A protein has these predicted regions:
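Glycine- and small hydrophobic-enriched segments that form the cores of compact globular domains
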Residues: 1-17, 22
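C-terminal cap/substrate-recognition subdomain and adjoining C-terminal extension
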Residues: 16-160
Length: 160
């Protein structure tokens, strides 16, 4: 994907606590392009960060970090890739409405194999329609196969 998109900057935004950084970094290094990891500052070693983290829900956290990325790169376009397990659709939809034209595409992996997840509600068409309300339907896509994501990214890169 990095080659197809001509080596763009990658940001890995997760609501996971910073304590998981070593594990997540190893995983990223084995499977994904190098990029900046943005994790929650939730640690007993930083009480202020822990309290803030506990008070902020996942969507608020992700939107605030995406706003920060936008402040760094307001003239670049971004592709957001997430999944249906938490609030990626809602976070990306909110940011796409807030910064029209800044997000070039949104791809959401419809996760179906996590037992603890409310798959029916998390993966419902209604949820995705609500999350992306007011956005052009061509901006976002929900997929279940990684090959489909690859095809979409290839097509996006050819569009320029």
């Amino acid at each position: 994907m990095a080659t197809v998109l001509q080596h763009p900057p990658f940001f890995y935004l997760s609501a996971s606590p910073y304590n998981l950084y070593p594990f997540l970094k190893r995983f990223r290094d084995q499977h994904f392009p190098t990029g900046t990891m943005i994790l929650r500052n939730a640690s007993w070693q930083n009480l202020g960060g822990l309290i803030t983290s506990l008070q902020q829900n996942t969507q608020e956290y992700k939107v605030s970090r995406i706003e920060k990325i936008h402040s760094w790169f307001p003239r670049r376009q971004f592709v957001c890739i997430g999944d249906s397990t938490q609030s990626d659709p809602e976070s990306y939809g909110e940011c796409a409405r807030k910064f029209p034209g800044w997000i070039k595409a949104i791809y959401i992996n419809k996760v179906t194999d996590i037992a603890e997840m409310d798959v029916k509600n998390r993966n419902s068409d209604e949820r995705f329609e609500k999350a992306f309300k007011g956005l052009d339907r061509s901006l976002w896509h929900v997929y279940t196969d990684a090959g489909e994501l690859r095809e979409r990214v290839d097509r996006l890169s050819r569009q320029g």
